[in-house]
Amino acid sequence: MELLIKAFIMGIVEGLTEFLPISSTGHLIIVGKFIHFTGNFATMFEIVIQLGAILAVVFYYRKKIFASLKNLKPGSWGFNLWFKIFIAFIPAAVIGLLTHKYIEEHLFSPFTVAIALIAGAIMMIVIEDTFGKRYKIDNMDKVDTKKSLLIGIAQVMSLFPGMSRSASTIMGGMLAGLSVKAAAEFSFFLAIPTMFAATTLSLLKGFSAMSLLEWQALAVGFITSFLTALFVVDKFLPYLTRHSLKPFAYYRLAVGVLMILLVAEKIVK
């Protein structure tokens, strides 16, 4: 029962943070430390429940996704959409495959997460102040291949735990001339292949070794993350049409500084 409660908590954390620019991985690491949810299963669990969150995006955009898949002839709207998503997916996929083992062994710690949270917060503030009002693209369908590649390169930053995939791609979109809303929507679509790939890699490494209780915990986390993420996606895009990203940046700064203090006092290791 204790494991299932922890899975429920982690599912809520994943769903709340996956599509906000505050780092789901960073929060999962931090919360996992506090509730003593760590180890090999926890590491895989944290990646696999992302599938629940990404399915929330698939469900939310189901009409647009199904419409795009009906016509994938070269030159069609559907083909162009997924080609641009594929181009943006490549940089993080390649570098992630080459570095994932090192990242898992050396960078999954509260201190590194804190540094990434703070660095990402500063970048968000600077980029929004510099490029936030200069956008020329207010619809993700108008993004071209070069801009897709720029967003994909920006996504590489998210390989560092605590940086946030959502924050990285939204910042990349703003640098490419997209509005915050268009950048966020592109980020949601880019999350589909990116997170499916990360989940598949994790499954191949350790899925068969799970016990019945661990399977149950995974199901609880999956369902919880799906429902929570669906709520967040529904509210986040409308929020971006009226508000700034800075509240998320300030939150990141506060959490990052707090984590450094907790690590310094050896309350969290």
Swiss-Prot record:
Membrane topology type: Multi-pass membrane protein
Family annotation (Pfam families): BacA
Catalysed reaction, written as an equation:
di-trans,octa-cis-undecaprenyl diphosphate + H2O = di-trans,octa-cis-undecaprenyl phosphate + phosphate + H(+)
Where is this gene product found? Cell membrane
Task: List the keywords (alphabetical).
Answer: Antibiotic resistance, Cell membrane, Cell shape, Cell wall biogenesis/degradation, Hydrolase, Membrane, Peptidoglycan synthesis, Transmembrane, Transmembrane helix
What GO terms fall under cellular component here? Answer: plasma membrane
Any single GO molecular-function term of the entry would be:
undecaprenyl-diphosphatase activity
State whether keyword Transmembrane applies: yes
In its miscellaneous comment, the UniProt entry states: Bacitracin is thought to be involved in the inhibition of peptidoglycan synthesis by sequestering undecaprenyl diphosphate, thereby reducing the pool of lipid carrier available.
Q: Which NCBIfam families match?
A: PRK00281.1-2, PRK00281.1-4, undec_PP_bacA
Q: What does this protein do?
A: Catalyzes the dephosphorylation of undecaprenyl diphosphate (UPP). Confers resistance to bacitracin.
Q: Which family does it belong to?
A: Belongs to the UppP family.
This chain belongs to the protein called Undecaprenyl-diphosphatase
What is the species listed in this Swiss-Prot or TrEMBL entry? Thermoanaerobacter sp. (strain X514)
